[in-house]
């Protein structure tokens, strides 16, 4: 019989060569300062929202060719920390105020959460004014009324208004579902969109003093909930003992795979990119660059 021919081998693409002629260019907007948050719209490749640290929320409908401010006249401060667009109802947009990237020079703190149900044409304030700096907003993929807010809290002092807040009525009322102490806020929140009952929250003891920036302490840690925020378990097997700011993301294609970018004691070189292959039970460092 005729021997079977081997399958064709697809040559790998040299991405550097493919994009060597592409040049970066600014697409604006030219007012507002730094940006620490942006969000697209599922199913719409042309529409994006961007939050700036001094100029409020901006929107593009044409892939970034033009931008327009959509928060002027509604917001009482221009410092935006988080934007989230509902996957099941794209006209529903939540915005958390107060930039979350702690640095030597910070803009004004935020004043809570705003919501739009008409894709940014109008806005309503939903409370949580004392959280001051919001780092992430997560919306249930099938119910826009279930929403979680990661609140870092005040930068310059101790306050209890920090942690993870949850609403089941579209932001009309809020319940604090994760709290560590009055110095530690939630810097990152990630949901398993294949099972929205599962959440990961990164808590960080942080603050700003006249002579230094604080990031990391006894209140820092990575937490997981399997019951939509009702209870939480601290997970740390394989992670550095000393934790600072963290970023966390659950793989959409595999809920068992979770990534964590961890700041740790830089002198000991313990930080970096960690991955879990069993939904947070164990962690392995795969890269020592934590930038």
Model-based region annotation:
Residues 2-291:
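Beta-propeller blade termini and top-face loops
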């Amino acid at each position: 019989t005729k021997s079977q021919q081997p399958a064709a081998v697809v040559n790998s693409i040299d991405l550097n060569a493919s994009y060597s002629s592409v040049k970066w260019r600014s697409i604006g907007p030219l007012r507002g300062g730094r940006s620490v948050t942006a969000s697209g719209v599922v199913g719409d490749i042309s529409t994006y929202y961007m939050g700036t640290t001094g100029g409020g929320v901006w929107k593009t409908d044409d892939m970034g060719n033009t931008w327009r401010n959509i928060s002027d006249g509604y917001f009482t401060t221009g410092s935006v920390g988080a934007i989230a667009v509902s996957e099941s109802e794209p006209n529903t947009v939540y915005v958390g105020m107060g930039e979350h990237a702690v640095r030597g020079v910070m803009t004004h703190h935020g004043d809570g959460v705003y919501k739009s149900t008409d894709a940014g044409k109008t806005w309503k304030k939903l409370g949580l004014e004392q959280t001051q700096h919001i780092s992430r907003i997560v919306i249930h993929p099938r119910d826009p009324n279930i929403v979680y807010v990661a609140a870092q809290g005040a930068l310059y002092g101790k306050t209890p208004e920090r942690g993870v807040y949850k609403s089941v009525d579209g932001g009309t009322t809020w319940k604090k579902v994760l709290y560590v102490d009055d110095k530690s806020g939630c810097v990152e929140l990630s949901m398993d969109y294949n099972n929205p009952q599962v959440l990961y929250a990164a808590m960080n003891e942080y603050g700003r003093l006249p002579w230094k920036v604080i990031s990391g302490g006894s209140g820092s840690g990575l937490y997981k909930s399997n019951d939509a925020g009702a209870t939480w378990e601290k997970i740390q097997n394989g992670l550095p003992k000393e934790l600072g700011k963290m970023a966390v993301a659950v793989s959409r294609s595999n809920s068992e795979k979770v990534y964590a970018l961890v700041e740790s004691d830089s002198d000991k070189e313990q930080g970096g990119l960690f991955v879990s292959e069993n939904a947070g039970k164990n962690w392995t460092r795969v890269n020592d660059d934590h930038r």
